[in-house]
């Protein structure tokens, strides 16, 4: 029996990055030998065991053979005669097909170290095309390592295009698509994930609402980048700089979906694109089974982001109504989330990346003022039932009006 550290732990250590999770491959062992050694079996489809002390995963070396459609259509063979090289060959990318033995020696049968040095994401074998989930995984790795200047090998991108054209992505479940997307949204450069999907044709299949934005122009005065798809990815990039929050990043991705519905005759203007985009956000989230909290924020951002931009001319009544509409009284975090997405929208434009966004500060300040109006005083004043809400709203409007007069500059005539 020989045990090897494999995959991401070896890859990240060679890149000088922190190693989070460790996975191990066991060569030359049987399931019974693992059980006798105190390991706990957890794998149903193939033998995976948990170490009795560390609880890290140890998998018996195995091969995989395509036996059906999609990413689940595989037959696994795990036995003592499966070699380490055979196990590594089934992996997606050469940089993930690395192993390390007890002495620290790196086993590299598929030139993974060379590709690490060359910052290249390259598939191990033609079997890559048997698993459509790998299209999303490669896009996610491209986003994860974009800051290290990794790129996808031409032949790998060509294979991803072929897989997409062959309809392989249609076998992916919504849950797996969302999980990969969610993981990609946590990376330093989530916009790269969606750009790669577009490069291989997968964006049109999995995110048609986002893909439809490319080629849709916006007024050059406000959007020097002109193309709404490009603006969307720039905005997502900016959101990633402003917040680690997946909710904020996903909402930013969806903020301009309504522009994809504007008739060409009306281009480059997109009047009413915010409310129009809400249905598309709902459609996308329902299809991918996006968690409700993330979906709800994305819908609110689509509807109200342009309103935030006009903050200096908003009436106090409108500001308080906005807080009502986003349910800020029960979910105050939404004020900060919407301020950040609106800022990302403004700064996600060519030449505006370093722009100040005072509207975000004013929104936060107005919220603190409105929130500070005590409900207790309204009740103690004798108001009852529906009157309480009406009076509380009136006082909030008055407080915001007083603050706005002092703190928020009046727009130029």
UniProtKB/Swiss-Prot annotation:
Keyword tRNA processing: yes
Source organism of this protein record: Citrobacter koseri (strain ATCC BAA-895 / CDC 4225-83 / SGSC4696)
Pfam families registered for this protein in UniProt: HD, PolyA_pol, PolyA_pol_RNAbd
Superkingdom of the source species: Bacteria
Cofactor(s) in the UniProt record: Mg(2+); Ni(2+)
Protein name, per record: Multifunctional CCA protein
Binding site for ATP: 8, 11, 91, 137, 140
Record-linked InterPro entries: CCA_bact, HD/PDEase_dom, HD_domain, NT_sf, PolA_pol_head_dom, PolyA_RNA-bd, tRNA_CCA-adding_enzyme
